[in-house]
Amino acid sequence: MTVKKLYFVPAGRCMLDRSSVNSTLTPGNLLNLPVWCYLLETEEGPILVDTGMPESAVHNENLFEGTFAEGQILPKMTEEDRIVTILKRVGYKPEDLLYIISSHLHFDHAGGNGAFSNTPIIIQRAEYEAAQYREEYLKECILPNLNYKIIEGDYEVVPGVQLLYTPGHSPGHQSLLIETEKSGLVLLTIDASYTKENFEDEVPFAGFDSELALSSIKRLKEVVMKEKPIVFFGHDIEQEKGCKVFPEYI
């Protein structure tokens, strides 16, 4: 079975210090990076990958003021970037979704998880546990009483949607290998690799464990060599220019 449609859905932007994208650079310049959600239409039902930024980021570039990330991360979010608004735009309500896949629980990927009180949220155990105590996780991204489906390691969500365990950027990060009807195999690295440079040249970037992150990149490179998918990176400004976004699909 294959995924009928894979939509790239813009979910705002985030100003991030260039040293977070390339750790060899000195801090000081902010880059204007895209934030993405991905909608998969499958035979079993619609699946949403990541939920964007939290409500607290709407028109609030100072979200991280007084924290470890002050001046390093500036969210650029409007009401139109709220996950419920995004879903309405693409024709769904929260209760329509079969699953939420949380690649990881950072603020720009899991900020909207609270909109889904009943939908199963698929998350790696290592990520769920780390988010309980590590300072880089906002409370909106690890709300109690949601319907978490906790997994460990690689996992097939439905036929054609494979989760690949790629820790490093965060303790329990996961990427996706998706078989689509239109474009064949697609690899979403998500934040296992922000950019093509991180991936192809193994340029280090921000994260929990740089050695583990590099191991995950090497693992994904092996997947690419074997499976020959189209590869999309998590926050690549140059790649964004050529991305087909909703209502187009791949």
Curated annotation (Swiss-Prot):
Cofactor binding note? Binds 2 Zn(2+) ions per subunit.
Catalyzes what? an N-acyl-L-homoserine lactone + H2O = an N-acyl-L-homoserine + H(+)
Coiled-coil residues: none
Q: Does the keyword Metal-binding apply?
A: yes
> Which keywords fit this entry according to its UniProt record?
Hydrolase, Metal-binding, Zinc
Names of required cofactors: Zn(2+)
Q: What is this protein called?
A: N-acyl homoserine lactonase
